Design a protein with these regions (language model features):
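Non-catalytic interaction/targeting regions
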Residues: 1-93, 97-113, 130-134, 154, ...
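Acidic/glycine-rich beta-solenoid
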Residues: 77-78, 96-99, 116-151, 156-173, ...
Length: 558
């Protein structure tokens, strides 16, 4: 039988045409539900040689005669990628259409010991156990070394970063991670049920988030440290149909193919979705009643979108790269690429002027310059330009930016690229001191110093400047929400609803005591201030469009 018909629950049909016998039977033609056809060609031993898409474009594959491994891929635009292997069939080199090469080296046991990225960066791998494929150390292009230790079961036990700081991992007898211990006393603990499902996560301060599941293993509830619940209900097929948080519910409906066709917000308003026979979104009608339509070509690319009469067309080159976009028949943006496929220009029209950004790269594909230009509407004469150049250090890290007519801005890094300082020309701008987690603890700029401290849970605790009036202390609740910012001049307190939305800000100072409430409808849209407008009867914006507030009226186009 050389023809197979597949019919799904929506009565959509796909037809597969096959050739060959027994183990060499292959699908050589596929008729899709929309009538489009794709084809495949195979050699005498069943290896893929070519694929032709629905638009008639062919991609060619060249397998090795002996191993069958792909050695070359040629895309419809004629550009090719090449792949090379050693006698163990391991990839040793790959060259992309842009000519850049990835290289890999292996030891006598077949383990990866060095990888050279297309931009020339080299990563090395070291092993201390001849019976393990897990590396004990890596060294990146900057020379920074990281080490790892593993259990005999292949579980990561510790990771030491480039500065010698250690993160340790604990596991239970089933191999599940039960704790992570980081520098600066930060730890996280995890608990599991008898089915191996995560049921609790606790931080160093004892704040615990719990998780509940149904019998099918779907996550049904997340209980925050303060006891508030975020629940999810599922249908018989395991798809989420309802989520509830703080008494507010959002629901989803699906068609027989499992696609979302209706989303109902907390306000009770709806967004609906329609799809074509290939499951591509073709229409969306939002909460506000606005309808957007989408059209695709035979290969699935978006080529036309309609937004209440505003028609946009999308155009591509042979490599499927976006080349220009038109709105109401007028060109809105253009994209240009060089022979390597790298983006070189992007432009648009603003008040008749052509505004563009031009990009330059080095031979490794790294951005070396970007030039902004503005041209005259009629003569195309250059009216204005500004160029910024980019430079890299010997390790390949970006470390210098040179704007037009200004000294270079240079940043100093350590390890694998952590920022340690910046300077303008030869003038130091700022220096950073970091803790064992590489978080900023001291910033020095001019005659000022900003000291930063963190809570045991890793949240920002305080920022103190040597100008005392600028000091700030931060307070958080058990759920990790910011509830207070205190400074010598004033204090601001924040309150939240059970859904986590900001409900009010209370500012106090020597001669100041202001409360600003933030009222929202169930979907989170701002409502009129209940204190300033006590007579307001508005309880929601059903279409998610705010029509007025205390100061303004808002009008929308189609």
């Amino acid at each position: 039988k050389d023809r197979i018909t597949i019919t799904d629950s929506l009565d959509r049909r796909e037809v597969l045409h096959t050739q060959g016998e027994a183990g060499l039977k292959r699908v050589v033609k596929k008729e899709h539900a929309d009538g489009s056809v794709t084809q495949s060609q195979f050699d005498a031993v069943g290896r893929l040689r070519a694929q032709t898409d629905a638009a008639g474009r062919t991609t060619e594959y060249s397998p090795d005669v002996v191993t069958g491994l792909i050695t070359r891929i040629t895309t419809p635009d004629g550009r090719a990628s090449a792949f090379y292997y050693n006698h163990h069939n391991q990839l040793t080199s790959a060259t992309g259409p842009d000519g850049l090469e990835l290289r890999r080296e292996y030891d006598e046991l077949g383990r990866l010991i060095q990888e050279t990225a297309p931009d020339g960066d080299i990563t090395r791998y070291r092993y201390d156990n001849p019976h393990s494929d897990l590396p004990c150390a890596t060294e990146d292009a900057t020379g920074s070394r990281k080490t790892m230790t593993w259990s005999r079961y292949g579980q990561l036990l510790s990771f030491t970063d480039c500065s010698g700081y250690v993160t340790r991992y604990d596991h239970d007898r089933f191999g599940q991670m039960t704790a992570v211990h980081r520098e600066e006393g930060l730890s996280q603990y995890r608990a599991y049920d008898s089915r191996g499902q995560l049921i609790a996560v606790k931080d160093t301060q004892g704040h615990e988030t719990r998780y509940e599941y149904n019998i099918a293993g779907d996550l049904t509830a997340v209980i925050a440290p303060d006891g508030s619940r975020n629940g999810t209900q599922y249908d018989a097929w395991g798809k989420a149909v309802r989520t509830t948080q703080g008494g507010l519910t959002r629901s989803m409906e699906y068609d027989a193919a499992g696609r979302v066709i209706r989303l109902t917000s907390e306000n009770g308003s709806h967004t609906t979705f329609r799809y074509d026979v290939l499951d591509r979104l073709i229409q969306e009608t939002g909460f506000d009643g606005r309808t957007q339509r989408y059209h695709h070509d035979l290969t699935g690319k978006l080529i036309r979108s309609e937004d209440e009469g505003l028609v946009t067309h999308w155009h591509y080159d042979e490599a499927d790269r976006l080349t220009h976009r038109t709105v109401k028949g007028e060109t809105a943006e253009r994209w240009q690429y060089d022979e390597r496929g790298w983006l070189t220009d992007i432009s648009h029209i603003s008040e008749g002027h052509r505004v563009a950004v031009h990009y330059r790269y080095d031979e490794k594909g790294r951005l070396t310059g970007e030039r902004q230009t503005v041209h005259h509407p009629q003569t195309e004469a250059l009216l204005w330009q500004h160029e910024t150049r980019h430079a890299y250090n010997a390790q390949g890290l970006a470390n210098r930016c040179i704007p037009d007519s200004l000294p270079a801005v240079e940043w100093l890094t350590y390890g694998s690229g952590y920022l340690a300082g910046m300077k303008l020309g030869d003038t130091p701008l700022v220096e950073y001191t970091r803790d064992r987690l590489h978080r900023e603890t001291l910033r020095s700029f001019g005659r000022y110093e900003l000291t930063t401290a963190y809570t045991p849970a890793g949240q920002l605790q305080s920022q103190h400047l040597n100008s005392l009036l600028s000091d700030r202390d931060y307070t958080w609740n058990d759920n990790g929400e910011l509830i207070r910012i205190s400074s010598p001049r004033q204090t601001r307190s924040y309150s939240y609803s059970t859904t986590g939305r900001l409900t009010g800000v209370h500012t106090t100072a020597a001669n100041l005591d202001i409360r600003i409430p933030y009222a929202t409808d169930p979907a989170g849209n701002r409502l009129p201030d209940p204190e300033l407008h006590p007579d307001s009867t508005l309880s929601m914006w059903p279409d998610n469009r705010i029509a007025r507030d205390a100061h303004y009226l808002y009008r929308y186009d189609r």
